[in-house]
């Protein structure tokens, strides 16, 4: 059996260990479950979303326009 050693921020460690304890899961069990999921599904068990404020604004504009589409006239020359 192998082992993994990693460095994390002290505050993050304390918060995550406390949350895991509430769930009745050890950090080793949590990491093992995550690695099993990745091995079986070849993807992370959560969505990675790191958006800048500008990107988040753009996403909101796109969502709004999709909710309320308006016709747009475009000529072939403009394409």
Swiss-Prot record:
The keyword 4Fe-4S does not apply. Changing residue 45 to T: In relB35; a delayed relaxed phenotype. GO terms for cellular component: protein-DNA complex; toxin-antitoxin complex. Induction: By amino acid starvation, by glucose starvation and by chloramphenicol; induction is independent of ppGpp. Autorepressed by RelB, RelE acts as a corepressor. Member of the relBEF operon. Operon induced by ectopic expression of toxins HicA, HipA, MazF, MqsR and RelE, but not by YafQ. Probably degraded by Lon protease during amino acid starvation. Degraded in vitro by Lon. The keyword DNA-binding applies. It comes from the Bacteria. Keywords: DNA-binding, Repressor, Stress response, Toxin-antitoxin system, Transcription, Transcription regulation. GO terms for molecular function: DNA-binding transcription repressor activity; toxin sequestering activity; transcription cis-regulatory region binding. Changing residue 7 to A: Loss of DNA binding, 100-fold derepression of operon, still binds RelE. One of its GO terms (biological process) is regulation of growth. Changing residue 8 to A: 43-fold derepression of operon, partial loss of DNA-binding, still binds RelE. Disruption phenotype: Essential, it cannot be deleted if a copy of relE remains in the cell. Cells missing relBE have a higher steady-state level of translation during amino acid starvation than wild-type cells. They survive antibiotic treatment in log phase better than wild-type cells. Cells missing mazE-mazF survive hydroxyurea treatment better than wild-type; further disruption of relE-relB and tonB yields even better survival. Dimerizes and binds DNA via its N-terminus (residues 1-50), binds toxin RelE via the C-terminus (residues 47-79). Tetramerization probably requires amino acids between residues 66 and 71. Homotetramer formed by dimerization of dimers in solution. Forms an RelB(2)-RelE(2) heterotetramer. Also forms an RelB(2)-RelE heterotrimer. The RelB(2)-RelE complex is probably the one that binds DNA and represses transcription, possibly as 2 heterotrimers, 1 bound to each of 2 operators. Belongs to the RelB/DinJ antitoxin family. Antitoxin component of a type II toxin-antitoxin (TA) system. Counteracts the effect of cognate toxin RelE via direct protein-protein interaction, preventing RelE from entering the ribosome A site and thus inhibiting its endoribonuclease activity. An autorepressor of relBE operon transcription. 2 RelB dimers bind to 2 operator sequences; DNA-binding and repression is stronger when complexed with toxin/corepressor RelE by conditional cooperativity. A number of site directed mutants give rise to a delayed relaxed phenotype; RNA synthesis resumes 10 minutes after amino acid starvation, an unusually slow recovery from periods of starvation, accumulation of a translation inhibitor. This is Antitoxin RelB.
